[in-house]
Amino acid sequence: MKNTFRFGCFLLTAMMSANLLSAQTGSINIVSTAVPFLRISPDARAGGMGDMSIATTPDANAAFWNLAKLPFAEKRTAVAVNYTPWLKDLGLSDVYLASLAAYHKVNDESALSTSLRFFSLGNIQLTDFSGNILNNIRPSEFSIDLGYSRIISDKISLGVALRYINSRLVIGDVGTGVVYRAGTSVAGDVSMFYNGRDESGAGLTWGITLANLGAKIGYTNDARNKDFIPANLGLGVAYTTVMDGNNRLMFGMDINKMLVPSLPAATGVFSTDSANLANYRSTGVVSSWFKSFSDGTNQLSAFQVSVGAEYAYNEQFFVRAGYFYEDKSRGNRQYASVGAGFSMDAFQVNLSYLVPSGSGITRNPLSNTIRVGLLFNISGQK
């Protein structure tokens, strides 16, 4: 991709700074944060089930969704690699999300895990307002984390993770008089998992996750000009039924809520809007988590819902389907997805496809998104 942006417009879109974004108007209450790539579904298995994965059966990708699942994993050590071309339906060819996750069970009750996400925004050519070329940049973002999870009772486990986040969008002075730098943050995850499956694998599972609880990100030395990261509360439930020795069906639901308050409503009065925005930006991180439940907007519209199912034959062939729903006032992402998987010995491949929807200006820009994932079980049964 070689997109040309006027520099001012690039800052408006790429920097993800709340003070540069439009405040909510009318019934539109989209929450803006830095590093939104942290909320992109990274793996193909979850992608085939409408981005549902908080309470599904554990594999290496659990490090992205709910690492508390990992002590209940059947394999002692596993690694997952995933690749997602992003916004292909818009003609972009070099924007992608790549991810890696791995875990190792220290014993039958605890596990160590790690995950890495790398998001490339492609090649972007910057120009000034006169059309003069400034330079070419390749913005990128990544996160890396380490986690520990442990079974605390026969059916319940807890997990914690520490994450480093780096967002390198613009570096140095590119003709505006402002010196930009990479934005960094440190965040944590806390999660719980209930495993009610019996020896055959049938039963109820559910989980709770608190993800990306961490410091704001800034792209300049101005301490007042920092943005929230996408803190999130997730609840998930799934049920697995084993029809016979060869056939298994799992279905479930995830509900997610961003722990970031909406921008203050625009009044049209510059002094008032400036004061409201300054007050919003001065909100502390911990305070913002609680304020997200009382920011003056319709809280029912703030919940994102994923429903999905997975059919497995002989734990070798997998078929998946799901649906993701987000209210129109919060971004209007609504799509169906399908997926498939094949497993042989220590190797598994997963694919997912986001079904096209809408047409013209209403066409979903995520249409035709394909995710590819590989899973390697390095050591045997737990």
What is each residue range found by the language model?
Residues 1-27, 237, 309:
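Bacterial Sec-dependent N-terminal signal peptides
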